[in-house]
Amino acid sequence: MLDDQIILGFETSCDETAIAILKGDELLVNTISSQVDIHEKFGGVVPEVASRAHAEMIRNIFHASLNSANLQISDIDIVSTTDGPGLVGSLVVGYNFAKSVAWSIDKPFLTVDHMVGHLAAPLIENRTMKPPFMTLLVSGGHTQIVLVEEWGNYQLLGTTIDDAAGEAFDKLSRFCGFGFPGGPAIQKIGEGGDPNKIELPRPKTKHEYNYSFSGLKTAATNFLNNLDPNDKVTKADFAASYQEAIVDSLLSNFVKAVNETGVKNISGGGGVMANSRLREKMNIFA
């Protein structure tokens, strides 16, 4: 049983060095060091820079987390870390550090799939949530529709065949000079804009539940390149329309999967789920 065991978790799959410490179900510490300021000047995450930043930060964050929880390293019962998917160099930093901690105190070492972590995240707010349910996982590198038949039994119904939704936000934001990360930047610029002002495609794929965002990104950049200076299109209208196209595409396949499988409960996970328009429209469907 894990009721009173102290669990130390590491997450370094992309551009955040994160450490959490739990005692059973109680969260004692959740420390996150973001690299957004480091990567902003590049317009996106640079893998080599990210792994170096993890290596520079992880030891300090580890000791700060122990101090915040008023614990000694010997108090830890289980050590866990993300082992993928993600940036290889970043994952290696967290994996090696976590494994060395587990080895030094002779405690169990567990690895966790990044996407399963996203999938289980709704349990933080709703401990009573039980399978079966359908989950929309939307992050910087992944876009997936997953049927959770039971814990440990997951069926991947749909995924992206090219860019993930997060990449679609980031790449267009970089092209337009809106800022990084692209999702929050486009959402902020699009506030007050007309999401129906610009007609952008909602790409379809041969597989009914799969996604494709490269065509949408190309259509948006072509629109800007061919824009007549006399056209009355604001940044807010453009950003809102692009965001709406991504959200509509995400929910179209997800709603179809839910309806065709007959699953009653739904959830969402991943960084892109922080998008307020996506959450709003998903709540309407729910």
Predicted regions and their residues:
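Short glycine-aspartate micro-motif
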Residues: 7-9, 80, 90, 133-137, ...
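Conserved phosphate-binding catalytic cores of ATP/NTP-utilizing and phosphoryl-transfer enzymes
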Residues: 1-5, 112-134
